[in-house]
Amino acid sequence: MRTPLILLALAAGFVLPACSRQIEPPGTPGACYHVQPTKEGLKFNRLPSAQPSLEHCAAALEAMRIRFLNMGGNQTEIAGAYQSNFLFLVSAGIYTSTSWEGARFLALVRSGDGRLVLPGAMPMSPEP
């Protein structure tokens, strides 16, 4: 008698979180956004110029981050959005995800001199 109740409770525990609504970015073509978490949720601030690709949006966000740091800011990690994808600019590179809470995938890495490049684009030095 208890087994069906336990199974029902376990099934509800797995199904209910899957039904929760995930935060998704705007899908406006060519629009690049800086995303700022607030107490009320996420605030999407559109960057002034249209960007042709996710990589260009990431570069525009990186330039914005560097400008703010040069003006005395202290925020080293920022988030953005481009055509239904979130961008997360962190020290290792730039990650992308289709939702704020979802899994993040590496889109661009930092080269030895700090530039952003596609993973595997930089030649590896030969092993000694």
What feature does the model see in each segment?
Residues 15-18:
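C-terminal motif of bacterial Sec signal peptides marking the signal peptidase cleavage site
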Residues 1-8:
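Bacterial N-terminal signal peptides that target proteins for export
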Residues 20-128:
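Mitochondrial intermembrane space
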